């Protein structure tokens, strides 16, 4: 759940 946009986004 950690992507470039931030944790919890995907």
From Swiss-Prot:
The keyword Mitochondrion applies. GO terms for cellular component: mitochondrial inner membrane. It comes from the Eukaryota. It is a single-pass membrane protein. GO terms for biological process: oxidative phosphorylation. Component of the cytochrome c oxidase (complex IV, CIV), a multisubunit enzyme composed of 14 subunits. The complex is composed of a catalytic core of 3 subunits MT-CO1, MT-CO2 and MT-CO3, encoded in the mitochondrial DNA, and 11 supernumerary subunits COX4I, COX5A, COX5B, COX6A, COX6B, COX6C, COX7A, COX7B, COX7C, COX8 and NDUFA4, which are encoded in the nuclear genome. Component of the cytochrome c oxidase, the last enzyme in the mitochondrial electron transport chain which drives oxidative phosphorylation. The respiratory chain contains 3 multisubunit complexes succinate dehydrogenase (complex II, CII), ubiquinol-cytochrome c oxidoreductase (cytochrome b-c1 complex, complex III, CIII) and cytochrome c oxidase (complex IV, CIV), that cooperate to transfer electrons derived from NADH and succinate to molecular oxygen, creating an electrochemical gradient over the inner membrane that drives transmembrane transport and the ATP synthase. This is Cytochrome c oxidase polypeptide 7C, mitochondrial. It comes from Thunnus obesus (Bigeye tuna). The lineage of its organism: Eukaryota, Metazoa, Chordata, Craniata, Vertebrata.
């Amino acid at each position: 759940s950690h992507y470039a946009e931030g944790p919890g986004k995907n």
